[in-house]
Amino acid sequence: MDVENGEGQVQVHLKTKQEHYAVPDVPYAIDGTVTTVELNTFVNALLRQKDGSSDTDFDFLVFDEYLRGRLCDHLREKAISFEDAIEIEYVERFPAPEPQDCLLHDDWVSAVKASGKWILSGCYDNTLNLWTNKGKHILTISGHTAPIKAVDWISLDEETGRFVSTSQDQTAMLWQWNVGSNSVECVSVCKGHERGVDSVSVSPDGLRFATGSWDTMLKVWSAEVEDAVEGSSKRMKESGVRTPKITLQGHRESVSAVQWMDASTLLTGSWDHTLKVWDLSLEGIKTEISTNKSIFDASYSKLNRLILTASADKNLRLYDPRTNQGSVVRNTYLGHNAWVQTVMWSTTEEFLFVSGAYDNQNKLWDCRSPKAPLYDLLGHGEKVLDIDWSNPKYIVSGGVDNTVRVFKSRKALADDAETK
C-alpha cells in the first residue's frame, strides 16, 4: 500500500484539551485520505459510544497546523514519516460570526473602535460619530478640519467617556463625553506633528497615548484631563493646546501603526518596511524587524506575544519580536485578493485575529491555519479601511462604502442563547 499517495492507513492518537470531548487514548487506524469531514464523523461516533452526546463540529490540528485537505497531503508537506503514530488534536470549531448591523455614514469610515455598549467611528467628512452596539446613532461630533484617520477610547464608565481622535489636519484631539446629557467637549488639541496623524494608541493605564504620523515621527502625549502643559504659554494652556511629552525619531516614512505592548513599550509599523519596538524609559529603539513590504497596520497580542502585519500585498504575516531572528516571517496567511489594510488580534482568544482588505472583505483567522481563514465576513461593498475586535462580543469594521459593519462574535452569540 502506498500511504503517501493516500492508499492504506495511518496510525493516529486523538487528543483534545477540552476534557468533556476526550475519547479513549488508544491508537486508531484511519485512511490516509481522510479530511476534516471524515474525522468529524469518526470522533463524533466515538463520543456517542462514550456518553451518547450529540454531534459537535471540530477542527483538527496536525503538528500545530489546521488540517485543510487530505491527511496524507498534510503529512507529506510537513515531511512527516507515515510510519510513525501521528497525534491529531481536535478543538471545537469556533462558530461563524453573524452580521448584526450596518451603520450608515455620510462619507468613508476610516476609523472605528468599540468599547462597552458603544461604537466610536471616524469619517472622511471630518466628523466623529457615536453609536450603540445595537445600531442606534447617538451623536455626531465636529472639530477636525480634515479626514479622521484613527480613534481610541481612553476611559469609559456609566457617566463619562473619554477618547482621542487623529486627523489629516495634523492634530490629535482629546474629547470628553457626558453620557447622561449626551454632550461632548474637546478637552485638548494636541499639536506637534507636521503632517497628517495616521495612528493612535492609548496606554494600558489610560494616562498617555501615542501617535504616528506622515512626518515619520512617533509622539507620546499625556491623556490626563487636568494635565498642565509644561513650558507652554499661558495662552496655550487656556486654549487647551497640548504638546508632546516625548518625540521619537527613527522611521523614514509614515508611521501607519502604533500600539502599546506594555506600560513602557511601544510597537510601530511604517511604510518604510519596518516594525520597531520602542523602550520609552530609554526613549530609543529596542528591536527592529525588517519586512519586504510597506506596513499599513500591525497588531500585537498580549496573549501570545506575537505581531501580525497588514501590508501592501495580499498577505498577512506573523513575527515573533522575542527571537534573534525577528525578521524571519513565522507564518504567512493567504486569503485576501487585494492589499490588506487592517488587522487586529482578538483580546480574549489566543489564536484568533481579524483582517480587512481592499477586496471589500473582512476575514476571521486562526493563526494555526495559514492556508485559509476560518470565515469570510461579508457585507462591505467597497474597500475596508479599519477593523476592530476590542469588545470580544463584536467585530466592527469601517469602509469606503460609508458604513460600519457589526458582526456578533461567539461571546455575543452565547449571551443571546442564554437569554432565549
From Swiss-Prot:
MF annotations from Gene Ontology: ribonucleoprotein complex binding
Provide a GO CC annotation, any one: preribosome, large subunit precursor
Q: Where is this region: Ubiquitin-like (UBL) domain?
A: 10-92
Localization, per the record, is: Nucleus, Nucleolus; Nucleus, Nucleoplasm
Return the similarity comment.
Belongs to the WD repeat WDR12/YTM1 family.
Q: Which UniProt keywords apply?
A: Nucleus, Repeat, Ribosome biogenesis, rRNA processing, WD repeat
Cysteine-cysteine disulfides: none
Q: Which InterPro entries match?
A: G-protein_beta_WD-40_rep, NLE, WD40/YVTN_repeat-like_dom_sf, WD40_repeat_CS, WD40_repeat_dom_sf, WD40_rpt, WDR12/Ytm1
Concerning Gene3D superfamilies, the annotation shows: YVTN repeat-like/Quinoprotein amine dehydrogenase
Instruction: Explain the purpose of this protein.
Output: Required for maturation of ribosomal RNAs and formation of the large ribosomal subunit.
Q: Which SMART domains match?
A: WD40 (SM00320)
Domain of life, source organism: Eukaryota
Q: What is this protein called?
A: Ribosome biogenesis protein WDR12 homolog
